């Protein structure tokens, strides 16, 4: 399944790359390894453009090794990791340190966002576009407290950023006022069902609208992350190449009634909102106003998530089951599988100018996932690879399973287990990306 069509084809991989695609290929040598994918789906490996793998500084929650194991188990072959670690990734030295950690430990291909702050606009301006996934701006306060709220700084970053800008869009003053009102009503025992009231649709729309306005004014490339409301979709068009939007799988799957059973486990920023928002976002995925499907994988320990509303951190582990979630939505008729491949594989590669990944093409790196449509997956906590060792999908049965994952031509996941060792490579980007 690739570039809008399905075909029964053999794929020859040599030295990590796809050498040939043909309806019938004879083994080039007696020692050639043959992987029989009869009756199964071969997809490009997913490129997840938003994950939090917590290293360095937050490794009590997760690390690049464990979360990359979960990634390849879920068919994710490349990830772009966010800068809100400790210390935050606010300069190229910190970013290169993270690359060095990933080079030793990651099973998946890796790239890292350079974080923006109120103080580092010149660092952002001088960044090498070939070495970073993009520039991340927290236009709303979230985990890690990297808020950029000075208008002059925002304008400068949008004017000079050498890459696409990825934004977390929530209006912090609105959220703080909603928190004050919630405390007045509930005291410290705020129910988790109030989360979408506190981190409200108005907060999202106000911030996303500002980001789009800045991008148009400064002719910047903007990618708005984790859109959660129907109203925000009106900011985007299917044919706009410079202003794009992402939706995350949990916002496509859960809705506000889910807080009753899952509570803190699905507390995330921005919040999961109404069923009508979920349906609107699914429609946006179909019609192209949503360009990218991703996870915002953000693990915390089980103990941390047991806190009260103001103490339990926002975020949940998703990367191991994101493809299965997308395929479940295909099964339910939300959108076709071709759309999943476009939004989760092809579009991230195009939007972020990724070199030679994201497609099943001759000459490209062999990042491939084999999916078995006849073998179901029951989410069992004994079979989770994220370090936090819990999932909001525990006990869920998915209709597909990930059979095998290749990363740069090497088997990274097979037989229900990630491989030992390191298979990931640093993702390469084009040098002109403004």
Regions picked out by a protein language model, each given a short descriptive name:
Residues 1-29:
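N-terminal metal-binding scaffold of metallo-dependent hydrolase/deaminase domains
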Residues 16, 39, 50, 71, ...:
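Divalent metal-coordination and catalytic microenvironments
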Residues 25-42:
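Active-site metal-binding motif and surrounding structural segment of the metallo-beta-lactamase
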Residues 40-105:
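Metal-associated gating/positioning segment near the N- to mid-region
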Residues 100-116:
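A glycine-rich helix N-cap at a beta->alpha junction
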Residues 122-293:
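Histidine/acidic residue-rich metal-binding segments in metalloenzymes
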Residues 189-210, 214-219, 265, 286-293, ...:
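His/Asp/Glu-enriched, well-ordered alpha-helical/loop segment
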Residues 308, 362-428:
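C-terminal cap of metal-dependent C-N hydrolases
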